[in-house]
Swiss-Prot record:
PROSITE patterns: ZF_BBOX, ZF_RING_1, ZF_RING_2. The keyword Transferase does not apply. Plays a role in cardiac repolarization possibly by stabilizing membrane expression of the potassium channel kcnh6a/zerg, or by assisting its synthesis, folding or export from the endoplasmic reticulum, in a heat shock protein-dependent manner. A zinc finger (RING-type) spans 25-63. It comes from the Eukaryota. The lineage of its organism: Eukaryota, Metazoa, Chordata, Craniata, Vertebrata. SMART domains: RING. One of its GO terms (molecular function) is transmembrane transporter binding. Zn(2+) binds at residues 98, 101, 127, 132. This is RING finger protein 207. GO terms for cellular component: perinuclear region of cytoplasm.
Length: 634
């Protein structure tokens, strides 16, 4: 489309190019006339945007973002903030002419001029005395031109009353009639104009700080991307030099391979540079927007009064928040490394002639950009792994080269075992699967036990097995030692497997993935066991306290079983004595007394020991019945 803004490559990345005038249109390079705001927060004159709509979309001439508009001749919404700033700047420069005598006076010299709000006309000092001296003009509101404010910002457009309150819920000013028409619940969110102005200034300061942080991040990202473009160029030169050096030694057999590798390097270079330039263009287009809005905020604060601020300040805050929340690509999406794997490509062509050296390490050293992006995450992950268990520090050293396993590790192991014959790695996998399943089962059992104890502790506030926590801790320590031993035994086999992997290039990828997954699974099991141990130690004091409370509330639980057995024997002897003395009585009386005795004995045993009164009553009944039984044979 004609009329786009094309920056040169050098100016596009220049940080000073963002310091443009906030009231000048990017297209016509003139002061804004009817400024329109696009969805990307770039602003242009309405006349500059006419004729650019295609399929109800308007493409931004600066960043290329498409804004949706309705109709062919439709335009984006008017930017009230910029229009206010443009009008404010124009008011300070234009001259004012008296409506009666045509006396011209600049607005800087406002002391000699007045303004009649009733007539909506400016008047000089002499005309004010001569024309408005009559009685019919006595009710006209005449104010100094310096103190005149726009009624649109000071009075309610619906009721023509002055604003007196501000609603923090609706973000709008209220006159006395608006306040009366509000619901009672909404009146609690109303504050006076002065308080609302102070709070609004504080919120705007916070929004400005967020935009400034985004501006600093964007500048740092531009510097980083410029450095990465230089790295890409340097790396592609280095890669091409290495390719050409190796090609010169094998010129006869690698002519075709040279063309392919150079093309691959160039393709990577073009792709990466194109990606970086696209991201750089996006950030370069973002800086003018940030600068314009920062200057806009400063100008708005300096030129707007309280009413104007409260009328449009929250729109500015909302816009700043939306700008900060837009998806800005501040980090490089790729590394600057150019890697064509030329050694492996040459080795494939000259495999009978070349001695295969050590393969390239899977974990290559990252560039400056990736180091800046991932340094904090790597430090946090390493610290979190080391703080769980002392033994984890040794295993975390090896975890740097451990790749994240795929979700199909177990399936890949089965497929690999089904494909090949008897190899050392196959034998290792068989042994490992058995050991791993055993350890996993032990960990799952411990997890179930801890979950059961935790559930009893939180829901029922009681424990069925107070000594189970110590058993879990002991078992956890044993499992931890088993995992460490298994991990060490698996780690010792790395050197042997690396030699085998060098010889079997076709199967090495699957085997390495499964092997590293095994180490990762062991690390995960060890981490779960560490979490389990920590939780068990935290629950231990609560279990001991509950056990002590239970012992205090139920003292009969502390009585040994031998006492209970002696009490049972005594009761049996008493029962036999009562039976022998009652042989002379009729059978019906004997059966009745026996049933009463059995009932009373059972009631005395089943009575809750906590109820002392009930226990004392039963005891008295038992003594009475025993005396009655003794008196029967008499």
């Amino acid at each position: 489309m004609s009329g786009e803004i094309f920056y040169s490559v050098d100016n596009l990345y220049d940080l000073d190019s963002a310091n443009c005038h906030p009231l000048v249109c990017h297209l016509c390079q003139e002061q804004y006339e009817h400024p329109c705001l696009l969805d990307c927060y770039h602003t242009f004159c309405a006349s500059c945007l006419r004729g650019r709509v295609a399929d109800s979309r308007l493409t931004c001439p600066v960043c290329g973002h498409q804004s949706v508009v309705k109709g062919i001749n439709a335009l984006p919404p008017e930017d009230r903030l910029l229009k206010f700033l443009v009008d404010s700047s124009a008011d300070s420069e234009e001259t004012v002419q008296c409506a009666n005598c045509d006396l011209e006076c600049k607005k800087q010299d406002v002391d000699a001029m007045y303004y009649c709000n009733t007539c909506c006309q400016p008047l000089c000092r002499d005309c004010r005395e001569t024309t408005h001296k009559a009685k019919m003009f006595s009710r006209h509101e005449i104010v100094s031109l310096a103190k005149r404010t726009k009624e649109a910002h000071k009075k309610c457009a619906l009721h023509e009353e002055f604003y007196i309150m501000f609603s923090t819920e609706k973000k709008s000013m209220l006159c006395i009639n608006c306040f009366r028409d509000m619901q009672v619940e909404s009146r609690a969110h109303c504050i006076d104009i002065e308080t609302a102005y102070i709070q609004g200034c504080e919120k705007l300061d916070q929004a400005v700080l967020a935009v400034k942080e985004l501006q600093m991040s964007a500048r740092e990202a531009i510097i980083l991307l410029k450095a990465m473009i230089g790295e890409v160029r340097a790396n592609v030169d280095e890669e091409e030099s290495a390719i050409c050096t190796l090609f010169s030694n094998m010129q006869e057999k690698l002519a075709e391979r040279k063309k392919i590798l150079l093309k691959a390097a160039r393709s990577q270079h073009e792709e990466k540079e194109r990606t970086f330039k696209e991201q750089l263009s996006h950030l370069a287009a973002l800086l003018p927007t940030l600068q314009v809005h920062l200057v806009t905020c400063s100008a708005f604060l300096s030129s707007a009064n309280k009413f104007e601020f409260l009328d449009m300040g929250y729109q500015l805050m909302e816009r700043l928040k939306k700008i900060v929340k837009l998806p800005h690509r501040l980090r490089p999406t790729q590394s600057s490394k150019i890697n064509t794997e030329y050694r492996s490509e040459f080795a494939r062509c000259l495999e009978p002639l070349l001695l295969l050296g050590q393969r390239r390490s899977m974990s290559t050293t990252g560039s400056v950009a990736l180091a800046l992006g991932n340094a904090s995450g790597l430090m946090q992950s390493s610290l979190s792994v080391q703080c769980h268990s002392p033994a984890m520090s040794d295993m975390s050293l090896c975890s740097s080269v451990v790749r994240r396993p795929t979700s199909h590790r177990y399936i890949s192991t089965k497929v690999l075992l089904a494909k090949g014959g008897e190899t050392p790695f196959m034998e290792h996998c068989c042994n490992y699967e058995n050991s791993y399943r055993t350890l996993q089962t032990e960990i799952q059992k411990l997890k179930d036990q801890v979950q059961e104890i935790h559930r009893d502790l939180t829901k029922h506030h009681s424990l069925t097995k107070p000594d189970s926590m110590s058993e879990i801790l002991e078992k956890s320590v044993q499992v931890d030692s088993q995992i460490s031993s298994e991990y060490a035994s698996v780690e010792l086999m790395r050197a042997m497997f690396e030699e085998i992997w060098e010889e079997t290039l076709q199967r090495v990828a699957n085997e390495q993935e499964i092997y590293e997954a095994q180490l990762h699974d062991l690390l995960q099991l060890k981490q779960e066991n560490s979490y389990l141990t920590t939780i068990s130690r935290q629950i231990g004091p609560y279990i001991r306290s509950i056990a002590k409370v239970k012992e205090r509330l139920e003292p009969r639980l502390k009585e040994p079983k031998e006492l209970k057995d002696d009490r049972t024997e005594i009761m049996l002897k008493l029962y036999e004595d009562s039976t022998s003395t009652a042989d002379t009585q009729p059978s019906n009386e004997l059966s009745c007394n026996t049933e009463d005795n059995w009932t009373l004995n059972s009631l005395s045993e089943e009575t809750n020991p906590k109820n002392k009164d009930y226990y004392r009553t039963n005891k008295q009944k038992n003594t009475t019945d025993s005396t009655n039984r003794k008196e029967i044979p008499m």
